[in-house]
């Protein structure tokens, strides 16, 4: 990016933790970055507060019933920001000239349409919505390639691989990539101990500040399983070339092993502002507000194999990747329903992988030849998981 050009950034999911980190980086560089569009799901008061601070040209609330509150709130603040509501408005703005860069941070499958719209329009896509890749990875990467869109991953692990691969012409020289995992807050516990885990315990991640759904995914290691599927789509690698290592310090974010015996790794403090700064300024580097890594102070780096017996979600994700077609979409949808039920206290922690496995084995796999096919598989998986939940409630 030329130093004199102003990058117009849309932040989808602005009221979440990734949105907050993105806006922090943007605010540090007013001479080169501007938040031109902010969106939120239903947190209209938080969205208004962000608009007052960042003064975007446009603000979108997904819940159309909250449009009057957004419109009137912007007027009361004396802002020229235009109010919009609904998914169609967001998709249209993502496709238009309001932005050249999109931070896709809407949680869950709800983020897919706007992510696809941005890709279709050839935008730089800072992808934090992992469900877009898991649900429709082939479609998204194909769409981006056809439109000349640039996908830069924001997950720390995929950003690390992106940075390592961009350091050389490595298109044919990769032996494998190794995703690191913190192990979550319950690393080392057996299934008997995991049965007693509460939602409050599961959302308290020891290293990263994240929303509740992603925190639970980290606790079950489904987060890492989804990242394996993402890495397959982002970097064109089969599952056999994607490994996972538990690294509790969360300082080595991922590694790339090359055929010549070299291994490159990217290290840094666990802070999403680093990867967002990479995506916003690439190929340049800008201050993210994150300090440097003091290895002497850290003292040690530990690595261990993941325990897939205690945390079967990682195994289920590999199973879905090997099955291909609609299987990853089924995995993702079942997990969203199961995690939501756990957070609401309807089921225990160990019910999450059990429900996901039930749905994966119940639904037949089909070729993922269109978005409609994928969305139908998503809807079917949700119905089957909800039915299994109702059965669980009756027999609890």
UniProtKB/Swiss-Prot annotation:
Cofactor section = Mg(2+); Mn(2+)
Keyword check for NADP, yes or no: yes
Q: Which residues bind Mn(2+)?
A: 155, 157, 227
Residues given in the record as 1-deoxy-D-xylulose 5-phosphate binding sites: 130, 156-157, 182, 205, 218, 223-224, 227
Enzyme Commission no: 1.1.1.267
Cited InterPro entries: DXP_reductoisomerase, DXP_reductoisomerase_C, DXP_reductoisomerase_N, DXPR_C, DXPR_C_sf, NAD(P)-bd_dom_sf
- Cite the binding residues for NADPH: 15-18, 41, 129, 131, 211
Q: In which pathway does it act?
A: Isoprenoid biosynthesis; isopentenyl diphosphate biosynthesis via DXP pathway; isopentenyl diphosphate from 1-deoxy-D-xylulose 5-phosphate: step 1/6
A GO molecular-function term, please? 1-deoxy-D-xylulose-5-phosphate reductoisomerase activity
What does UniProt give as the signal peptide span? none
Question: Which reaction is catalysed here?
Answer: 2-C-methyl-D-erythritol 4-phosphate + NADP(+) = 1-deoxy-D-xylulose 5-phosphate + NADPH + H(+)
Alphabetized, the UniProt keywords read:
Isoprene biosynthesis, Manganese, Metal-binding, NADP, Oxidoreductase
Kindly give the Gene3D superfamilies that the UniProt entry links to this protein: 1.10.1740.10, NAD(P)-binding Rossmann-like Domain
Q: Any keyword Iron-sulfur? A: no
Q: Name one GO biological process term.
A: isopentenyl diphosphate biosynthetic process, methylerythritol 4-phosphate pathway involved in terpenoid biosynthetic process
Indicate the family of this protein: Belongs to the DXR family.
Task of the protein: Catalyzes the NADPH-dependent rearrangement and reduction of 1-deoxy-D-xylulose-5-phosphate (DXP) to 2-C-methyl-D-erythritol 4-phosphate (MEP).
NCBIfam families, alphabetically? Dxr (TIGR00243), PRK12464.1 (NF009114)
Protein name per its UniProtKB record: 1-deoxy-D-xylulose 5-phosphate reductoisomerase
Q: Which organism is it from?
A: Xanthomonas euvesicatoria pv. vesicatoria (strain 85-10)
